[in-house]
């Protein structure tokens, strides 16, 4: 990776420490094949963002810098993502099961303090990374 800011091994170690701090089981031996494969793909996305310097683990929290692929007024914005709380789950109250995108935006809003509409304007790369973190939180 040409724009590697930190080594893959360090990024993986920080990811594992973050999972432990958040209560996320990252041992794929405890998962069925489909869950292990899904977890591994999501982990790769987070590790890649960490290696590039866009995502930084900070004492159990995450600071994510929106990439320059998102619109100008979003690129470079730093989002602090704290430890998961009950707010993640109550953010989805009242939404129908069919409103998956809206639920995910509500969870991302609860994670970052940004309004739901903020995420709709991000480039897919940034959205998918934040969505991945949200999914990890929802699996606790």
Locate predicted features:
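Short, surface-exposed, charged amphipathic helix/loop patches that serve as local interaction elements
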Residues: 1-140
């Amino acid at each position: 990776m040409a724009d590697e800011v930190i080594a893959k091994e360090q990024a993986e170690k920080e990811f594992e420490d973050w999972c432990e701090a958040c209560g996320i089981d990252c041992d794929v031996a405890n998962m069925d094949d489909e869950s292990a494969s899904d977890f591994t793909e999501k982990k790769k996305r987070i590790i890649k963002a960490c290696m590039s310097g866009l995502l930084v683990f900070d004492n159990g929290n995450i600071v994510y810098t929106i990439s320059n692929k998102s619109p100008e007024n979003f690129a470079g914005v730093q989002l602090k993502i704290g430890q998961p709380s009950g707010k993640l789950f109550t953010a989805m109250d009242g939404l129908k099961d069919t409103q998956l995108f809206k639920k995910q935006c509500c969870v991302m809003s609860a994670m970052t303090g940004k309004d739901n509409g903020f995420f709709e304007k991000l480039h897919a790369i940034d959205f998918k990374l934040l969505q991945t973190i949200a999914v990890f939180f929802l699996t606790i």
